[in-house]
Amino acid sequence: LGGFFMKNTVKKNVKFSLKKKIATVLTAAVLALPLSYSTISTPSASAGTADIIGAVLGGIQASSEANALLKKYDQSEEGRQIWFDYMKKKNGVNPDPNLNQRLERIMTNLSKAVAAVDPSIHERPYNYFVNKDKSFNAFCSLGHNMSVNTGTFYLLPSEDELAFVIGHEMGHGQKNHVAKGINKSIWIQAAGQATGTGVLGEWAAEILDSTQNTKPQEKEADKLAFEYITHTNYNPGAGAALWQRVMEKMKSSPSSWQRFTSDHPSDDARRDVNSKYVADYSGGHVTAKDGIVYVNGQTFVKPAAHGDMSGAERSYFVQGNLAAAFHNKHNEKPAYTEGNIVMLGDQPIISCSNADENAAVLADRLNAIKDSKSVKGSKDSKKTRTNKGEKSKK
């Protein structure tokens, strides 16, 4: 739970004592891993009512004790620090000053943004560190303890996209997704062990719909990340741009991503939903599809690739800049150029590379379409993308 790209790693057919099962549940939280219930045995036909009642009592007692520990590590300051220290020991700490400064800056900005949406963040300010893992991931564990993999910084040179990843994890933290998931897991594991047959554990799993909550939680965290971003100067198109980048960069090694696809929404779905958030933020004026940005249903620009960023990824950043302009009423002023940058009021829209259309041409086009009425049924109802990490001045 909470990990950007984490999936079940608990081995099948391994028998644990109740204490070890609970410990496994809690330990997995350090890595924000969803748990498997494959260790619960097949129901016994001889299990009667008395067995089930006894299992209920045993499960309640065991889960109550485990929940007391869970509450300690999740909510008390002492427990949060113990958990944070364990996370650092478990994952390793990268002392790189540049990466840590970037994380510090983003966390400072996002913490203020989260507070504007949910003041409860002040009750448990986030602890965070950069770990040594070179893969792409970030996770929020118990007690608002967070970590970002070193590899995430390498894959995402844009601070806007990095901020979206971190905002996503803070969304998990604010909604207590990790603790809630562990709580369910403890109850199921305790109940299953108490029967010795897995009958109650199987029923509990069905009733609580345990791991099936992962996709809704991921969607909720993405939506919260977008909301947090709109309370900062980061580009609101960063979420859509991020998922476009992930799809493109991981084509050559899909196996590294297939580990989590059953637990998380697909990358293209997450991109499209985030682009819809951007369109809504613009008041329905700005959309993007297939690398083309539309304003009021009319083609504005198809950004070219630049550096290691594709035209499609850039288009989501352009969409984000335009959405910010419309949201903040900069569209009431004329578009113009500052060198190779197209401006709309005080809002930068796109920094044109040599492969893009001329900035003056784009400014003239934007002036011609920004006040027109949206064309129903046009491609603007699809999705949005944005340019190379330009920030939204709000």
Residue ranges and their predicted role:
Residues 80-84, 96, 100, 104-111, ...:
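Extracytoplasmic/secreted envelope proteins and their assembly/folding machinery
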Residues 54, 177-207:
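Post-HEXXH active-site segment of zinc metalloproteases
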Residues 9-29:
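Bacterial N-terminal signal peptides that target proteins for export
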Residues 48-186, 232, 252-255:
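Peri-catalytic and regulatory segments of divalent metal-dependent proteins
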